Structures are given as structure tokens and as C-alpha cells.
Amino acid sequence: MSPPSASRRTREEVDATLQVAKLNATELLPTVHCLSFSSGTGGAATGDFCLLELEPALCQQLEAGDSFVIRGDKDEQAVLCSKDKTYDLKIADTSNMLLFIPGCKTPDQLKEEETPSAIVHTEIFGFSNNYWELRRCRPKLKKLKRLLMENTYEGPDSQKEEDASRSKYTTEDLLNHIQASEEEIMAQLQVLNACEIGGYWRILEFDYEIKLLNHVTQLVDSESWSLDRVPLTVCLQELGPLEPEEMIEHCLKCYGKRYVDKDDVYFELDADKICRVTAEMLLQNAVKFNLAEFQEVWQQSVPEGMTTRLDQLKGLALVDRNSRPEIIFLLKVDDLPEGTQDRFNSLFSLREKWTEEDITPYIQDLCGEKQTIGALLTKYSRSSMQNGIKVYNSRRLIS
């Protein structure tokens, strides 16, 4: 509703106000906004509405018709997700009162008017002393693996598949549970080598995954195929009687790169991935492994034509050069805490001092868009020299 005529300001009253404020009317736009509170004021102040500050890119997405989703369970801090990014939601207080004024025109809009109005009486719908601001954050993806590991896939003949009570998750289920954008979730599903079976996302039981990979590599060896030219059709024909064709193809996708040549589909096997998963298989049942012995067994265990290297194990295994003999043991970055401080605490509880080369694979994923490994180490550790090598230890006392 508009303010009653008795409360409307006249031109004379506006000019008098400008004079008291010592403002020159000729230096201002001719249109004057006279603000008044509407009878409905108060709804926004009591929490019926909130303001959300958007960066220009997000604003453009919203104006283009894209939607944003706020995700989080009751025990989690809410995040806002666009189609490809995740943002922390933080309340920011402001010393100035923020007014909600529907239809209010900005100075630029007023300049475009051919016949500007002398006085515009505008109602204030509501007000607020705070707003939500967005801060880009890392997607919270540890929960994704945890959910999928509740019911791993051991093959079509497993008795587990007959148990309908076991948890399974569709894409929609994961979007409802995981605090990450859809693109980030789908990318992580690829990292986890997850596959969609019967409409549900599943992680293959490690032993079953190794079994599938062995079928493929043994066939490659028996047929004397080049590692960069493994024909899909022949693989499915030869291995189909042993395992479901979709599982064979999934294995090839996980450990190879698909390409088409003369209408035939081939896969180029990734030697680094195969060497890495073979090392994981060897290390998973050993607390510690003599490094020299491990390297010998490891090289013997991979397909002919592949060469094992320790740099293939970054973020998977750690070498202790100070022990005699030198040892290697499994330390997966996936098993470390998701929070930055908790991650550093965990690493420094395992080893008091780290070189940058050793610790980098275990903190690389903590870096934000513009954050570097060096900045993280400066904030969460202290550096010193040991035998001419820079090492890092905790800033905090680790119990």
C-alpha cells in the first residue's frame, strides 16, 4: 500500500532537506526517492527472508536459469552447490541496515529515463542487519567413499546381492547425502572406480577388481597384444563366459583409455595405474615391507612390458629411508582426515618430520584454488634443516 497523501513529501520539503544537508541539487539526479516503511515491514527482519551475496559468475548462472542447492545433514555445516562448485555458507553482519525495496531504480537506470520523475515515493518492504556470503571450499567427498564401502560389489554370484536390506545409492541419493556439486560427485565416482549397476552406484570389492584386471592382463599376454591396442570386442568374447561383459568393460575403462580406430573400439592400458594397484595388492596385507624385496616382487608381479617406479605410489605408500633396512608401507591419502588441521595432526603423529617431497602427495588435495603447498606448510608446520635437507614438523604438540 502507498503512504497516505499527508505523509508524502513535497518538492519544497525535499529542497529544504537538501539545504539542511548542504547538498547542491544541481549536482544530483533530478529524481528523488522518498522512502517509507510499508505496513508489512518486519517479515524480513524476523527471518522470513535472507540476503545472499553472489559473485558475478554465480549471478549469471542464476539469471540464465540454473539452480543452486543447499546441502547438508542435520549434523553438518550447510554448503551451497552450483552445478560444478561447492561453497561454504557464512553469515556476515553489517553495521549498516540493508533495506529491501521492490522496484527501486539505481542511478544508472534513472539516467536512462527520458522523462525522469521529480519525486518517487517508495515503500521499504523489509530490512536486515546481516546476509549470507559464499566462500569457495573443497567438496566434502570422504563421505562418498564411506557410503559406497558399506556394500561393495563382489560379483553377480555373491550372496550379498541377494540381501535386499543392504544399502545402495542412486545418483539422486548421493546428491542428497554428499556436500558437493553434481560434477564434483561424478568426477569422484570415476576416481573411486565406481560403476552403476542396476541403477545403483557401487565400488568393486578390491579382490574382485584385481580378479577382473588379472583376466584382462592374462588375455593380453596370451594373445601377445600391444598394451596400447587391446580390442574391446575380443575381450568381451573371450572373457564373457568368466565375468559379466559390463564388468570387463568397466575394468578396461578404469585401467585404460578408450579410442576408436576404423569403427573398432580399443583400449590403451595405463601402465602407471596397473603398477599402482598391483603395489596396493602386495602391501595391503603387510604392515611393513622391506623396500628392496618389495621392489623385486612388485616388478615380477606386473605384466611384461611394464616398469615399476616408486613415483607411481604417491599418496598410496610411504618409504622410510631412515630405517635399516629401508621399508615401505601402505598409507593411502583416502584414509586420512578431510579437515586440514586434522590431516596435519594425523601425518605428524605418524612421522615427526617430513620432507616436502614426502608430504606433498598427502596434502595436495587440501589446496584451494589459489593456495599452494608452500602456503599450507607455512601455516600448519615449522621448517628446519636436517643433514642439509629442509624438513617440516608440527606447530602443535602431537600426543
Swiss-Prot record:
One Pfam family here: Dcc1
GO cellular component: chromatin; chromosome, centromeric region; Ctf18 RFC-like complex; nucleoplasm
Oxidoreductase as UniProt keyword: no
An example Gene Ontology biological process: regulation of DNA replication
InterPro entries, per database record: Dcc1
Keywords: Cell cycle, DNA replication, DNA-binding, Nucleus
Subunit structure: Component of the CTF18-RFC complex which consists of CTF8, CTF18, DSCC1 and the RFC complex. Interacts with CTF8 and CTF18. Interacts with DDX11.
Similarity remark: Belongs to the DCC1 family.
Role according to the record: Loads PCNA onto primed templates regulating velocity, spacing and restart activity of replication forks. May couple DNA replication to sister chromatid cohesion through regulation of the acetylation of the cohesin subunit SMC3.
Name of the featured protein: Sister chromatid cohesion protein DCC1
Gene designation per UniProt: DSCC1
